[in-house]
Each structure stands twice: as structure tokens, then as C-alpha cells.
Design a protein with these regions (language model features):
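Segments forming oxygen-rich coordination pockets for charged ligands
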Residues: 1-206, 222-223, 258, 264, ...
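A generic structural signal for alpha->beta connector loops
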Residues: 182, 202-203, 246-247, 275-276
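Short amphipathic alpha-helix with an adjacent loop that forms part of the alpha/beta core around
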Residues: 211-221
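Short, well-ordered beta-strand core segments
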Residues: 205-206, 225, 250, 286
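Adenosine-phosphate binding glycine-rich loop
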Residues: 248, 253-321
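Beta-loop-alpha module in the N-terminal Rossmann-like domain of NAD(P)-dependent dehydrogenases
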Residues: 232-236
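ADP-ribose/adenylate-binding Rossmann-like module
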Residues: 188, 224-225, 229-230, 240-265
Length: 321
């Protein structure tokens, strides 16, 4: 096993520990004082041979964490460390000037982690409780990330899932971008070449045979739907179905004029005004993006900005992704 497992491995600390029988330590941030590189609830995995997955700082403390991980594997007892402000480790400084409390949990119960992995794969909101003294794990249906008495709770909301409808470079580039970062996604297109390019980028693809939102396509409150069509007559039937579901983001590429025409058509189809108000367009934080790459980054930034601010259950994605 390499000393530092790449993020591209596709595993997060929970899944990695659950599926690897080697002795491991879970390191999780239980408290933050001042600025911090990672949020409360962020975690990394450290194995007995020094291998690790994830990071809790910008490289300041990970090597030291590996040393302490070896110690807790030897004792079998959890341990909480303080780094930065107020830390006894005066030779290790955090450039941000803040402080971190980190719990080291030796040999976490793999059975609990396996069940947690299954729930997350099924896109279920869930949480896990960790007794900071005994290391006992409790699987919860939900919970707020933070320390409650002697139990530290981490909530896990599903990752944002992207449903990308469209044809051409914009749809291909955006799908490849979200795929490269590790977000679940599905590219739906009437165009064979678009689907081939998307599949070559590792995206899941589906042939869109007619302008409609597929009846068997399931969405949830962590779903983002984005349309990249130059042929705008495909949009209204798809948007009609998209706006009828719980997706937190629905947007379509196009100018302000195209947006106005789109809204009139949807209104004529009977879409309620409250649902029309949910439709984003022109999409993206950068106005008048002129190339597929800039547009893709712009749209992704807008979606993730909304994902971290909308008041739906589980918007705080402080779990171990």
C-alpha cells in the first residue's frame, strides 16, 4: 500500500477502512477554533504501515498524526490531540493560526462502517456516533455534526448528483468535470457522439430518445439538473418533469432572451409560478461565458454555492467525502 493513497482511488476513509482488513485508525476533527483547512467532521484513515487516505490540514500535521496512530493501535484506546492554538506540540504550527481537536479511533468496527457505506451508496441521510472514550460506534438515522457529551456525531448527506441533459461540447465538458471531481452523474443526450465522449470520460450515459424527462429517472433533494441544449425545443418537456421533482437545482444554458421564451412556454404548460422561480438561467456565476470549459466551471461553482446554502435537510456535507 502506498504511503499516501490518491483521491482518484474513489474511496473515502470509511469505505477504505470497511473494505480493508488491515489495522487502521480513523482520525476525525471534533473541534475547530478559528480558521481551518477542513470542517468539523472531516476525517482521514491511517493504517499500521503508515499509509493514509485523506488529509486534515494542508500537510502540517499528517505525518505527526501517523506517529500517534501507531501509538493508539498499540494501546487500543482512542485519543484526542490538539494542534495549533493551545496545543502542547509547540513545534507544529498551523499557518492559518487556528486550533484543531482531532480524535484518533483505533480499529473502528468494520461492521458498522460497512452498513454505513451501504446506506450512503443508497443515498440515505444518516449519521454515526462515536464514544470518544471507548470508541464504540452507533449508526444513526440522522444527527447534527458535533460533540454531544461524550459522543461525537457526524452527519452524512448524499453527495450532490448531477443529471446533465444536452448535446455537444458544453454537455460533454461539464459531465467530464463533475466526473473528474468524483460527483455521481448521468449524461442524457439524443446525440450518439455526445454519449460516446461522455462514456470515454467515465460518465454514466443514457440515450434520450425524445424530449421528455424519463419517467423512471429518480431525483432527490441532493440532485442538480442542468441542461445544455442549443436546440431549445428539447428544453420545455424536460424542464417540466425536472421542476416537478425535489431537485434543489434546475438550470438551463442560454441567453436571457432564451430564458424568457423558456419561461413563457413552461407557464403555458401549466408550471406553477413558484416552480418557475426555481429555474436558473442564464446559468453560472460568470456571465457570458464564451467557451465550454469556462461555462462548466462557472455552472459547477453556482451549483455548489447553492448546495452549501440552501436550507434543506443535510445541506451540511461535513461527512467523510
Amino acid at each position: 500500500m502506498n504511503s499516501l493513497l490518491p483521491a482518484a482511488s474513489g474511496l473515502d476513509p470509511i469505505e477504505a477502512i470497511a473494505t480493508n482488513r488491515d489495522d487502521a485508525v480513523l482520525a476525525v476533527i471534533t473541534g475547530v477554533e478559528g480558521p481551518s483547512y477542513r470542517a468539523v467532521g472531516a476525517a482521514m484513515a491511517i493504517w499500521a504501515d503508515g499509509s493514509r487516505l485523506g488529509a486534515l490540514s494542508s500537510g502540517c500535521i499528517e505525518a505527526d498524526l501517523a506517529l500517534h496512530a501507531a501509538q493508539v493501535l498499540a494501546t487500543g484506546k482512542p485519543k484526542t490531540l490538539r494542534y495549533g492554538r493551545g496545543s502542547p506540540f509547540i513545534d507544529i504550527q498551523l499557518p492559518c493560526g487556528g486550533g484543531l481537536d482531532i480524535l484518533l479511533l483505533p480499529r473502528p468496527d468494520r461492521r458498522v462502517f460497512l452498513e454505513l457505506t451501504k446506506r450512503r451508496a443508497a443515498r440515505q441521510l444518516c449519521a454515526i456516533g462515536i464514544d470518544i472514550y471507548s470508541g464504540a460506534l452507533t449508526l444513526l438515522d440522522d444527527g447534527t455534526t458535533g460533540l454531544i457529551g461524550s459522543k461525537f456525531v457526524v452527519q452524512f448527506a448524499p453527495k450532490v448528483r448531477f443529471l446533465v441533459f444536452g448535446k455537444g461540447p458544453e454537455a460533454c465538458t461539464f459531465s467530464a468535470l463533475v466526473q473528474s471531481i468524483g460527483y455521481p452523474n448521468l449524461l442524457l443526450s439524443p446525440d450518439k457522439e455526445t454519449l460516446e465522449i461522455g462514456a470515454a470520460s467515465g460518465c454514466d450515459v443514457q440515450h434520450l430518445r425524445q424530449p421528455e424527462f424519463p419517467a423512471d429517472l429518480i431525483t432527490d433533494q441532493w440532485t442538480a439538473i442542468v441542461l445544455f441544449f442549443h436546440d431549445h425545443e428539447w428544453e420545455p418537456p424536460i424542464l417540466f418533469g425536472a421542476l416537478g421533482g425535489p431537485a434543489f437545482y434546475v438550470g438551463a444554458q442560454g441567453s436571457a432572451r432564451a430564458r424568457d421564451v423558456r419561461l413563457l412556454e413552461l407557464e403555458a404548460m401549466g408550471v406553477a409560478r413558484d416552480d418557475l422561480a426555481r429555474l436558473h438561467g442564464p446559468v453560472g456565476l460568470i456571465r457570458s461565458a464564451r467557451d465550454p470549459a469556462t461555462l462548466s466551471v462557472s455552472v459547477l461553482a453556482e451549483v455548489l454555492d447553492i448546495a452549501t446554502s440552501v436550507p434543506f435537510t443535510g445541506a451540511d456535507r461535513s461527512g467523510w467525502d
